[in-house]
Amino acid sequence: DYPKMFGLKPEFEIMTTADLLDSLLREEKLRFSRPLNLHVTYHDPCHSGRHVSIYLPELEKEKVFEPPRNVLKALPGVKLTEMPRNRELSWCCGAGGGAKSAYPDWAIWTATERLKEAQETGAQAIVSTCPFCRRNLSDAVEASKTPLQVYDLTELVAQAL
C-alpha cells in the first residue's frame, strides 16, 4: 500500500512471520531440537489468505498458503492434517473485520463451527498465524468446552527450539 499511498518504495522486504520462518528453514538458519508430539490442523486466516489474494493477485497461491504449512511440517513430532475447507476456501473464524466486536455471539458460533471441523481431523490443536483468530478460537474453546488447544504458529516454533 505504501507505494500507492505515499509514492514510497521501502528499502526492505515486507513479509509475514510465516514467510520469514519458512525462509529461515529453507536457508537452514533455523533448526529445531525438541519434538512436540502433537497432531495439529491449520486454520487459514482471512487476512493472510483471501484478503492477500484479493489485494495482491500477482502472488501465487502457494506463496500465500504454503509457508505456515511448511513450518508446521518441519516441526519435529508434529503431524498436520488439513480440514476439508482450507486455503482460499477456509471457513472464517468470525473475528475479523470488527465482527467479534459487533456480533460477539455470531463470532463465537462461527469459531465453534470451525472447531468442529478441526476436531473431525483428529487433531489435538488448531494453529493459526492471526492473533484475532487465535483469540476468537480460544474464546470458542472456552465457551464450548471443546478439548482442543489453540496456538499461534510462533508458539509452536518457540517450543521446538
Q: In which residue ranges do the predicted regions lie?
A:
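Iron-sulfur cluster-binding electron-transfer modules in prokaryotic oxidoreductases
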Residues: D1-L161
